Regions:
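Periplasmic-binding protein-like
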Residues: 19-23
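Exported/periplasmic ABC-transporter solute-binding proteins
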Residues: 6, 10-14, 25-26, 30-36, ...
Length: 196
């Protein structure tokens, strides 16, 4: 099942029949671990990503980076309550000191694909997504990469075995494969880095 990590977390909490949870953030994984819904000993950070500021290819925006992000008329981000990229965006914008002043210009999306779409179609002047998402679209370009100093933790993608799985061996095999050099080679092709 593919969806935002927050939505997948909620589905697992409601009993979704799943074997493995591959999250785009540590918060959702930690919540499921704390609820004993993911086996703690199976969790590892497989990948790392970056948060980036994007604009449409044909955009005439004057926003040149995080320093003047407040100049944007509409800023698309994932909903911070359910979308990890949105949570990271909120953290970065809060640490920049602009979160409160841009509330009326935020367009909250249900996942990063919706953020991309809003920027691609210029329904939003700019957006905040992961670098790998930006790289997947030929209709957007990266304006700036979020400085790590704006985030308390790096953008890590943990994976873990769902405690209720009836397929423990298969889940462990999948996790082992996704952590392998062979899989990492493919992930790197799409802009990911090895997680810590």
């Amino acid at each position: 099942v593919y969806d935002s990590s927050g939505k997948l977390q909620l589905q697992i909490e409601k009993g979704l029949d799943a074997d493995v949870f591959f999250s785009a953030a540590t918060a959702q994984m930690n919540a499921l671990k704390d609820e004993d819904l993911v086996d703690a000993d199976s969790i590892s950070n497989v990948l790392e990503n970056k948060l980036v500021l994007i604009k449409g290819k044909d955009s005439t925006t004057t926003v040149t980076g995080f320093d003047n992000i407040g100049d944007a008329s509409i800023i698309a981000i994932g909903d911070p309550e359910v979308v990890p990229a949105g949570s990271y965006a909120k953290e970065a914008l809060t640490n920049l000191g602009v979160w409160d002043s841009i509330q009326d210009r935020l367009s909250l999306a249900g996942n990063v694909t919706e953020v991309l779409s809003q920027v691609e179609t210029q329904n939003a002047e700019i957006g905040l997504v992961y670098a790998t998402d930006a790289a997947s679209s030929d209709k957007v370009e990266v304006v700036a990469e979020c400085d790590n100093s704006l985030l308390a933790t790096p953008v890590l993608y943990p994976i873990g075995r769902v405690s209720s799985t009836k397929h423990k061996d298969e889940a462990d095999s999948l996790i082992k494969f996704l952590k392998s050099d062979k899989a990492l080679k493919v992930f790197k092709k799409y802009g990911f880095k090895k997680g810590e």
